[in-house]
Structures are given as structure tokens and as C-alpha cells.
Amino acid sequence: MVSFSKNKVLSAAVFASVLLLDNNNSAFNNNLCSKNAKGLNLNKRLLHETQAHVDDAHHAHHVADAHHAHHAHHAADAHHAHHAADAHHAHHAADAHHAHHAADAHHAHHAADAHHAHHAADAHHAHHAADAHHAHHAADAHHAHHAADAHHAHHAAYAHHAHHASDAHHAADAHHAAYAHHAHHAADAHHAADAHHAAYAHHAHHAADAHHAADAHHATDAHHAHHAADAHHATDAHHAADAHHAADAHHATDAHHAADAHHATDAHHAADAHHAADAHHATDSHHAHHAADAHHAAAHHATDAHHAAAHHATDAHHAAAHHEAATHCLRH
């Protein structure tokens, strides 16, 4: 009986020890889970706060002097941007692929929304433009460096290798000014904001010093335009994209009052156009050279790209959707 009682006491002691150990483990696990949950919630909150302004910017460094470059809608998914917001290795430009000082153009030189545009924003290999892959001095670009002095730049996303989209005052609210290749020097674009679909210009050169080039609706897909610079108030160009009859204007630079030219296409040397603003469908000009000092030289109903921008508008309009999709789970 004594031996049996000792066994009962021993069993009870073992059971109590196991129960205590189990309780301690439960308390430890609960505490650990609580800490993990708090840490996870903190991480989620920090991630949410971070992505409010720099969505999916991998290694973005120094978005310098970008005043209100936050609230850039869809300026996301930039990788290794240096001195730029939410861009992939863009050097001084936002979301332009190797654009040099140009906006939304492929190798455009000093022109906006051209393929190979030089000095334009939102172009592939654009130098000094915003919204470019490897853009220099612009925000929301792949390898963008120094998107400086971009005041209120909105939606200047998706340019590859753009360089120096500097001094773009109010380049904000550029709706879908993306996907220009090798644009160069879209610098000194004052109020190049609210350019709706200013994408896809090929080889435009020097769309620099475009004062108030803002509100250009669909000013995209200009191929090999050279020196569309010094366009003062080239704003409110509705469907200046993808050459709604302003196609084939190579070097449509410095055209004074080439604005409101409806279907002014295939103009050679349309330079010195002051107030080229409100040019309805003055886009997609291919290799036009120096329609200089054409005061209101608007060609009515010229051919080559009546709404050819549709496929570009498709490509440019909300092209950031997949980036939103990619970051949707992270945001929530």
C-alpha cells in the first residue's frame, strides 16, 4: 500500500510538472505570437506608409528637390533608382527607358513623348527626363538619378534610362506620360504637367524649354522629332499623341504658335512654335525637320496616324495597373 501511494504521489507530481510545463509553453507561445503579431502589424503599417509614396521603389536614393513628388499616382515599381522616387535605376528622370532630357519618347532628343527622343521625359533611354528607365534626375524611373526640381510631378512614371528631367516645374499630373525610349533633355519644361498620354515618341530631339507643355492629351508616339524646344505654352494639346495628323514632324522645334494646329502632320522644320499648345492631335510626326517659325502653320487633315495612338493609349493608359496589382497585397 505504501509503495502504491508513493507511485500515486509520484504520478501526480509528474502530471503537475507536465501541466506546468505545458502552461509555460502556452504562455511563451502566446507571448511570442503576440510579439510577432505586433511586429507584423508594425511592419504592415510601416510598409503601408512607405508604399503610399514610394511604391515598389527598389534601392531608390535621394529624390532631391522633388516638391510634392509624392502623391505620384502609379509612379511605382522602379528598381535601383538613385536620387529619384520610385524608379528603377533612372538617372535624373522618371520612368523613361534611356531617354535623354525628353519626356515619354524613344530616343527623342529634346522632345516629349518620342521614341528615341533626346531631352524629353518619359522615354526609353531619356536623358534628363522623368518617368524613364535609367532616367537621370527624375522621379519614378528605372535607375533614375536626381529627379531634382520636379515640382508637383504627377504620374511621370515608367521611363527607362532617362537623364536629367531637371527644372521641370509642375511636370505633375502628366497622365500616363510613360514609355519613351532614349529621349534626351526634356529639361526646363515649365508646367509640362497634366500631359495625358504623352507617351511613345520615337527619336524626338530637344523638346526642352517647353513652358506650360502641360495638359497635352495624348502627345505621344512622335518618331525622330528633333528640337521641339522652346515651345512656350505647348499645353492643352488634346490628342497630340501618336500623330493624330501631326505625324512625321522631325525637328518640330521652336515653332511659334504651332498651337491649335489640328492635323498638322508631316511638317518639316516646324521649329520656333511659340504656344504650340492646344495642338489637337499634333502627334506622331516622323522625321519632320525644322518647320521653323511656322506661325499657326496648322495643316488640316494631313494623313499618317488618325488616332494611331489607340494602341499606345492602350499601352500607356493605366500601364501602372500591373504595378498596382503587384503591390496590392503589400498595401493590404
From Swiss-Prot:
UniProt biased composition (Basic residues): 152-163
Query: Source species, please?
Result: Plasmodium falciparum
Q: Which cysteine pairs are joined by S-S bonds?
A: none
Query: Which portions of the chain have biased composition (kind: Basic and acidic residues)?
Result: 74-151, 164-176, 185-197, 206-326
Pfam families named among the record's database cross-references:
Plasmodium_HRP
- Report residue spans for region: Disordered: 62-332
Protein name in the entry: Histidine-rich protein PFHRP-II
Q: Which UniProt keywords apply?
A: Malaria, Repeat, Signal
Signal peptide range:
1-21
